[in-house]
Regions:
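Non-heme di-metal
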Residues: 1-180
């Protein structure tokens, strides 16, 4: 049987969207419960949010042949999704909001569209890095930091294994000092 184009595929997308939305809502509810002094209720919302995340993951995997796609595929999909959001979706939402007199919401839609454009650019650059084998190697010396223990080193490539905590190269990134 072919899942693509079936009512079951539509149901999987609906289930994925519903579980994803529930997860976010319950996370927001947990935050509010904490602020209002209800730690137990917050913990139950958080637990349920994590359950919903796993339900969404299960449906997402079914939609993708039983597994999460590769990082390259995910970066491509993410970039394409962000492109749609900033070029079509939020642009249309802003126009409608403006026509209906919701000027402040139109401005928010446009503001988020600008952020989505940045997201697309970031994903496309990361995709270039993966395809060009430039995630852990760069032209010229860079300052690398281990995301696990904070070890810092300088070189064209991150170490294969952190000499301090023994975590693999996957834990390294180019150090960014954005607080200076």
């Amino acid at each position: 049987m072919e899942l693509k184009g079936s009512k079951t595929e539509q149901n999987l997308w609906t289930a994925f969207a519903g579980e994803s939305q529930a997860r976010n809502k319950y996370t927001y509810f947990a935050s509010k419960a904490k602020k209002e002094g209800y730690e137990q209720i917050a913990a139950i919302f958080e637990e349920t949010a994590n359950n919903e995340k796993e339900h969404a993951k299960m449906w997402f995997k079914e939609l993708n042949g039983g597994e999460i796609p590769s990082t390259v595929e995910n970066l491509e999909a993410a970039a394409d999704g962000e492109n749609y959001e900033w070029t079509d979706m939020y642009d249309e939402f802003a126009k409608v909001a403006e026509e209906e007199g919701f000027k402040a919401l139109a401005a928010k839609f446009r503001g988020v569209a600008a952020i989505e454009k940045e997201h697309e650019e970031r994903y496309r650059k990361l995709l270039e890095n993966v395809k060009g084998d430039l995630v852990f190697s760069k032209d010229g010396d860079k300052v690398w930091i281990c995301r696990n223990c904070g070890h810092v080193c300088i070189g064209k490539s991150a170490p294969k294994v952190c000499p301090v905590c023994a975590h693999p190269q996957a834990y390294f990134e180019v150090k960014a000092d954005n607080y200076m």
